[in-house]
């Protein structure tokens, strides 16, 4: 055994997938995982910088690790991910106890860099981004035993004015379809029952290499033996096609859940955000989804407090929310990100106004979610058993194909089983029920 490592992951599912590839390299080098900071010989923080709160958490944790390193000077401490890409050497200037800073395009170099630092103790900063690089054949140490994250592409070409992602993840680069399918097959062979295909905008998959588009890839993955559920995220509304909708409709294992971030319900703000669609265009795409996939769940993201937002804009968004009736909406306060066009826009919205509007938005959505779930009372749904509930070990937790959490009494079922559950107590965020035996 070379030593022990601990990795902390902040941010999106893509960061989780990157961290699994980092862990794979460390384990291949002889390191074993520990959850105890004091026992670790290597500590990594895989970071996010989409919102200021994410960066604040990282800086707080960096301060904690400084105290650990004072008692364990041989500890190797590295910062990876989007915040590492954005800040680079600034992180080391601010916190000299950091040994290396590794950008989003250098995940594959982790094993080598850790070995070099262990031997030479020379600090490293590597945040170079190759516009075309897609690394394959990295060892993967997956978390869990049921659901596997499978990146299909990296980067983003959309440049929404509020978003830092294109600057820290680079331009879109798609993996070759045969590489994605091979990874899914390996996951199935390892016992995984569900895969989630990941990308900043999965609907753009394949535009760079032309070998297959996202609908083609979905069909290939749907055919992999042993995989019972196929999910994907995230979709940009401008790129969702009738071909993709038909592929989901005709698939066997493709789940009837589409996350389609609208971000706002006012054309004026959508234009300022550079979302390149209108409310009307989004509405039509959502209509096509619901027409082809009755019973599918539609979820979204919404940002409150974008620069220049007026009460009239916000009222339009509330009206749009009531019209769309999403199963769930992930709501966020606008976070000013230096280097993005929105950060320099006039009429930044005061924090107290942002918070008040967010509360109003969430109240409307909670009411909608509760009403939609109430419509499932007495329905029988297929649930994949994921494990014990966080709050009660006597209760199983699982999800439907439409991505709704279902809680039901612990019986003879095992993790990974697929069971039929009758819904008896619909709630805003979860469904409670009983197994149909």
What is each PLM-predicted segment?
Residues 12, 206-227, 273, 336-367:
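Radical SAM enzyme [4Fe-4S]-AdoMet core and its adjacent flexible, acidic
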Residues 160, 180, 197, 232, ...:
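Conserved, mostly hydrophobic/aromatic
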Residues 143-146, 156-158, 254, 264, ...:
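Short flexible coil/turn linkers enriched for glycine and charged/polar residues
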Residues 49-50, 169-170, 271-277, 344-349:
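Short glycine-enriched, charge-decorated loop/helix-capping segments at active-site entrances
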Residues 74-81, 86, 189-311, 322:
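Conserved SAM/AdoMet-binding glycine-rich loop
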Residues 344-437:
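Terminal RNA-binding accessory module
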Residues 1-205, 243, 258, 280-291, ...:
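Proteins enriched for Cys/Gly/acidic motifs involved in redox and nucleic-acid/cofactor modification
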Residues 9, 34, 272, 329, ...:
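Thr-Gly-centered strand-to-loop micro-motif
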């Amino acid at each position: 055994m070379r030593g022990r490592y601990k990795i902390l992951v902040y941010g999106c599912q893509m960061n989780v997938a990157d961290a699994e590839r980092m862990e794979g390299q460390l384990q291949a080098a002889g390191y074993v995982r520990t959850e105890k900071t004091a026992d670790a010989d290597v500590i990594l923080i895989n970071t996010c910088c989409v919102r200021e709160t994410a960066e604040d958490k990282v800086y707080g944790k960096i301060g904690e690790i400084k105290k650990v390193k004072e008692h364990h000077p041989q500890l190797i401490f590295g910062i990876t991910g989007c915040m590492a890409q954005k800040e680079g050497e600034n992180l080391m200037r601010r916190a000299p106890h950091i040994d290396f800073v590794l950008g989003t395009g250098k995940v594959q170099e982790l094993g080598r860099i850790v070995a070099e630092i262990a031997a030479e103790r020379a600090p490293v900063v590597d945040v170079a981004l190759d516009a075309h690089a897609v690394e394959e054949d990295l060892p993967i140490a997956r978390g869990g035993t049921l659901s596997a994250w499978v990146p299909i592409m990296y980067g983003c070409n959309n440049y929404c004015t509020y978003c830092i992602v294109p600057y820290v993840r680079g331009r879109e680069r798609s993996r070759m379809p045969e590489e994605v399918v091979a990874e899914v097959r390996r996951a199935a062979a390892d016992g995984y029952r569900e895969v989630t295909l990941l990308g900043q905008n999965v609907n753009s998959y394949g535009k760079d290499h032309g070998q297959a588009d996202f609908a083609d890839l979905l069909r290939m993955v749907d055919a992999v033996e042993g995989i019972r559920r196929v999910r994907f995220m995230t979709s940009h509304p401008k790129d969702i096609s009738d071909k993709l909708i038909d592929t989901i409709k005709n698939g066997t294992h493709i789940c009837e859940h589409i996350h389609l971030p609208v971000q706002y319900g006012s054309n004026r703000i959508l234009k300022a955000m550079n979302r390149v669609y209108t409310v009307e265009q989004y509405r039509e795409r959502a209509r096509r989804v619901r027409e082809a996939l009755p019973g599918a769940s539609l979820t979204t993201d919404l940002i409150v407090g974008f620069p220049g937002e007026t009460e009239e804009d916000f009222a339009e968004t509330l009206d749009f929310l009531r019209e769309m009736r999403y199963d769930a909406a992930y709501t966020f306060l606008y976070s000013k990100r230096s280097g993005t066009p929105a950060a320099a826009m006039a009429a930044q919205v005061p924090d107290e106004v942002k918070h008040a509007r967010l509360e109003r938005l969430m109240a409307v959505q909670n009411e909608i979610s509760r009403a939609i779930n109430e419509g499932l009372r007495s329905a029988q749904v297929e649930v994949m058993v994921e494990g014990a509930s966080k709050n009660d070990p006597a209760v199983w937790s699982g999800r439907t194909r439409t991505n709704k959490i279902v809680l039901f009494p612990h019986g003879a079922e095992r993790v990974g089983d697929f069971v039929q559950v009758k819904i008896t107590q619909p709630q805003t965020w979860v469904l409670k029920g009983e197994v149909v035996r």
